[in-house]
C-alpha cells in the first residue's frame, strides 16, 4: 500500500487544496452556465463570468 514517506507541511497542503478548489469551482460555474443555456433553449451560445466568487 502506498503511503507518503514524509509529513506534508500545512502550508503546502493548504496550497494544493486551494488550487484544487479553484479548479473545481471553475468547472462548476461552467456546468451551471451550460445547464442554464440548455434550460433557456439557447444552447448555441453560453458564457460564464471570469470572476470567481469569494
UniProtKB/Swiss-Prot annotation:
This protein's record includes keyword Zinc-finger: no
The family database entries (InterPro entries) matched by this protein are listed as: Ribosomal_bL32 (IPR002677), Ribosomal_zn-bd (IPR011332)
The alphabetized UniProt keywords are:
Chloroplast, Plastid, Ribonucleoprotein, Ribosomal protein
Ranges for the region named Disordered are: 1-20
Subcellular location per the Swiss-Prot or TrEMBL entry: Plastid, Chloroplast
- The UniProt record lists the keyword Ribonucleoprotein: yes
UniProt-recorded Gene Ontology molecular function terms: structural constituent of ribosome
Mind naming one GO cellular-component term on file for this protein? chloroplast
Identify the Pfam families for this entry: Ribosomal_L32p
| Gene Ontology biological process terms from the UniProt entry | translation
For this chain, the family text in UniProt reads: Belongs to the bacterial ribosomal protein bL32 family.
Q: What is this protein called?
A: Large ribosomal subunit protein bL32c
Q: Which organism is it from?
A: Euglena gracilis
Q: Which gene encodes it?
A: rpl32
